[in-house]
């Protein structure tokens, strides 16, 4: 059975251009703006900003 909640799956893509991404969920009602967070990119081997993109 599917969940009723307002959480949507999102993809956080690296801005370093390596193609690496993380997936997570986000509550669209409390955070309508696009997310940007600094996370570790194992391809670049350093912390870089990750920006929210749509899951295709």
Curated annotation (Swiss-Prot):
Q: Where is the composition biased (Polar residues)?
A: 15-25
Q: Which PANTHER family match?
A: 54S RIBOSOMAL PROTEIN L39, MITOCHONDRIAL, LARGE RIBOSOMAL SUBUNIT PROTEIN BL33M
GO molecular function term, any single one: structural constituent of ribosome
InterPro entries per UniProt:
Ribosomal_bL33 (IPR001705), Ribosomal_bL33_CS (IPR018264), Ribosomal_bL33_sf (IPR038584), Ribosomal_zn-bd (IPR011332)
Renumbered to this chain, the Basic and acidic residues biased-composition regions fall at: 1-12, 30-40
UniProt organism field? Cupriavidus metallidurans (strain ATCC 43123 / DSM 2839 / NBRC 102507 / CH34) (Ralstonia metallidurans)
The family line of this record is:
Belongs to the bacterial ribosomal protein bL33 family.
Sorted alphabetically, the keyword list is: Ribonucleoprotein, Ribosomal protein
Instruction: Provide a GO biological process annotation.
Output: translation
Positions in coiled-coil regions: none
Please name the Pfam families in this protein's record: Ribosomal_L33
Query: Species lineage, top-down?
Result: Bacteria, Pseudomonadati, Pseudomonadota, Betaproteobacteria, Burkholderiales
Q: What is this protein called?
A: Large ribosomal subunit protein bL33
HAMAP family, sorted: Ribosomal_bL33
- Ranges for region Disordered: 1-40
Q: Which GO terms describe its cellular component?
A: cytosolic large ribosomal subunit
């Amino acid at each position: 059975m599917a969940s009723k909640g307002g959480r949507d799956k999102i993809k956080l893509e690296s801005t370093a251009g390596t193609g690496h991404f993380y997936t997570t969920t986000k509550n669209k009602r409390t955070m309508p703006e696009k997310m940007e967070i600094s996370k570790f990119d194992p391809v670049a081997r350093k912390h870089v900003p990750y920006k929210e993109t749509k899951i295709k």
